[in-house]
Amino acid sequence: MACGATLKRSMEFEALMSPQSPKRRRCAPLPGSPATPSPQRCGIRPEIQQGQQQPLGGDLRLTPEQILQNIKQEYTRYQRRRQLEGAFNQGEAGVSNEVQASCSSLTAPSSPGSLVKKDQPTFSLRQVGILCERLLKDHEDKIREEYEQILNIKLAEQYESFVKFTHDQIMRRYGARPTSYVS
């Protein structure tokens, strides 16, 4: 019968995993990932056609329009968050939204307050930092998922070739003889 055994490598092979090593390390799972294994992490081949796969980083270039759209979406999320925080704080302070609406409707468009708003930048430096962090995090998550998917596909292919090789070795050694429990 075919039997495989492995030995643990000694510490002298630790140099393979040094930063100068040409070998790649597997990406660590994300800190917020679920504890239950997903189909991708279990080595189950995802249902993706081979023709649909694109090389890593193939369509990851963002056009200026996409960047602008992403920044606008992130800014609206940021504004909603600020509005919710403001509404919560106003509710605690006892200030009603109706009073604020009536005060804001009294200001004329030609008043000096509206001119100051036109001169101010659309985003503060802090807001731009938050927007960029969020966009980078989303982009990094997409890259991680794609990388993990590619690794799982390669692992599944390697496993299939191992099973085929083992089967071929068994058939070559024992041929068409019936298997028995006595060797």
Swiss-Prot record:
Entry keyword set: Nucleus
Region annotation Disordered: where it falls in the sequence: 14-43
UniProt xrefs under InterPro entries: Akirin
Residue interval(s) of motif SYVS motif: 180-183
Family indicated by similarity: Belongs to the akirin family.
UniProt cross-references to PANTHER family, sorted A to Z: AKIRIN-1 (PTHR13293:SF9), AKIRIN-RELATED (PTHR13293)
Main function: Molecular adapter that acts as a bridge between proteins, and which is involved skeletal muscle development. Functions as a signal transducer for MSTN during skeletal muscle regeneration and myogenesis.
Descriptive protein name: Akirin-1B
Organism: Xenopus laevis
